[in-house]
Swiss-Prot record:
UniProt record, GO biological process: lipoprotein localization to outer membrane; protein transport
Location of the protein in the cell: Cell outer membrane
InterPro entries in UniProt: LolA/LolB/LppX, OM_lipoprot_LolB
Keyword Transmembrane (UniProt): no
Primary subcellular site in the record, as a coarse category: membrane
Residues lipid-modified (S-diacylglycerol cysteine): 26
Organism placement in taxonomy: Bacteria, Pseudomonadati, Pseudomonadota, Gammaproteobacteria, Alteromonadales
GO CC annotations, alphabetized: cell outer membrane
Protein name: Outer-membrane lipoprotein LolB
Membrane-topology annotation of the record: Lipid-anchor
Length: 214
């Protein structure tokens, strides 16, 4: 059984059991207590954010769909995939120098999150570039193919590692005061990834009022 089929089976098993295990089986990440919701006028102002949405991955042999929760900051990423009933089936926690993946009841570690995810799942997903694309930004290895009437990217090619990633910004929305993508489609060879952002929240350090202790 290939890695994608194994994960699909894991998600299906969690879904069928979640009616019995919903209260005991759901996992939540501990709160990021040093950050709180903020409003920004440009997504580039947010060095940290969290999102909730849908993720779909498709290969010639299989496909899967899951809910995605991603909390991103400059020094930490916490990514969770769940079934539609909220049962956690995959968590990936990483820093610039370490990564921990929990999937199918097993734990895997590496010093690189993208390499770890590819080694275990078989997906070569551009985790380092996704935070830029999620916020509608263009990276140094991106070549913009088309822009919309407001100058936002519609399509780009990432040439860092061949074959290149083709990224399409299908729609945009206003979240936390900024314009961010609503739907993204990524394609590389025979791998296709679709991401829908249902909620994107900018995060920042809470303001300290005069007279308050930090």
């Amino acid at each position: 059984m290939n890695n994608l089929k194994r994960l699909t089976k894991t998600i299906f098993s969690c879904f069928t059991l979640s009616a019995l295990l919903l209260l005991a089986g759901c996992e939540t990440l501990p709160p990021m207590t040093d950050l709180s919701p903020i409003t920004v006028t440009d997504a580039r102002q947010a060095t940290a954010w969290e999102l909730q949405g849908k993720l779909a991955i498709k290969t010639p042999d299989d496909k899967l769909s899951a809910n995605i929760y991603w909390r991103h900051s400059e020094d930490r990423d916490e990514l969770t995939l769940t079934t539609m009933l909220g049962t956690t089936v995959l968590t990936l926690n990483s820093t610039p120098n370490s990564a921990h993946l929990h999937i199918d009841g097993k734990d895997f570690r590496d010093d690189n999150a993208q390499r770890l995810l590819e080694r275990v799942s078989g997906w070569s997903i551009p985790l380092a570039d996704l935070p830029l694309w999620i916020t509608g930004q263009v990276g140094p290895n991106d070549q913009v193919i088309a822009r919309d009437s407001q100058g936002k990217p519609k399509q780009l090619t990432n040439t860092q590692t061949p074959p290149p990633w083709q990224v399409a910004f299908l729609s945009w929305q206003s979240q936390s005061g900024a314009s961010v993508p609503h739907q993204l489609k990524l394609e590389r060879g025979d791998l296709q990834l679709k991401l829908q952002l249902n909620q994107w929240q900018a995060l920042g350090k809470p303001a300290i009022l005069v007279g308050e202790q930090p």
